[in-house]
Design a protein with these regions (language model features):
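Non-catalytic terminal/accessory regions
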Residues: 1-169
Length: 169
């Protein structure tokens, strides 16, 4: 209870334990946009692997039929993260988007190839800098998530995905 916190710890309590209003935004789902759909709950652990595969393939089928829907960078980030976790996506959806190999900085790719996990994570932190992850452009978020996928640090990746993908209100 906030009333029981000593006066010299009230700021700490409100920022870290009590929760500040800016961090307590709830997720609003928009099932018309892939990366804002209920499927993002997979990264909370709220979705069975078989169920996410089935639902994602249904969703991609709708997208393929709808010529007006263009996959955004965040949609691609979402799909690539699921693929990294071993989620099977039907081959008929492979042509929905293209990935450029040049999107990963060479120095980070070299660290990943040499299994220098700590160095690669520090480099990612350096890229993020003092910015909030929500404020970073989609291309940079893509390469950060791609790095975390390759390093198999899913816990960190999932927390970042839940910050950047869903619509917060």
């Amino acid at each position: 209870d906030p009333k029981d916190v000593p006066s010299n710890f009230t700021t700490f309590h409100s920022e870290n334990i009590g929760g500040s209003p800016s961090n307590d935004k709830s997720i609003k789902y928009n099932n018309k946009v892939l990366h804002q759909s209920k499927l993002v709950n997979y990264f909370n652990g709220d979705y069975a692997k078989s169920k996410i595969e089935e639902d994602l393939n249904k969703y991609l089928k709708k997208i393929k039929k709808n010529k007006k829907y263009v996959l955004s960078k965040k949609d691609i980030i979402f799909i690539e993260a699921l693929k990294s976790d071993g989620i099977e996506i039907s081959k008929k959806y492979d042509d929905l988007y293209k990935i450029s190999a040049t999107e990963m900085p060479a120095d980070i790719q070299l660290m990943i190839d040499n299994r220098e996990v700590g160095a690669a994570l520090l480099r990612v932190i350096e890229v993020i800098g003092s910015e909030r992850i929500e404020d970073i452009d989609d291309d940079t978020v893509y390469f950060i998530i791609n790095t975390l996928n390759q390093l198999n640090v899913d816990l960190i990746r999932n927390k970042l995905l839940l910050k950047v993908l869903p619509l917060k209100v």
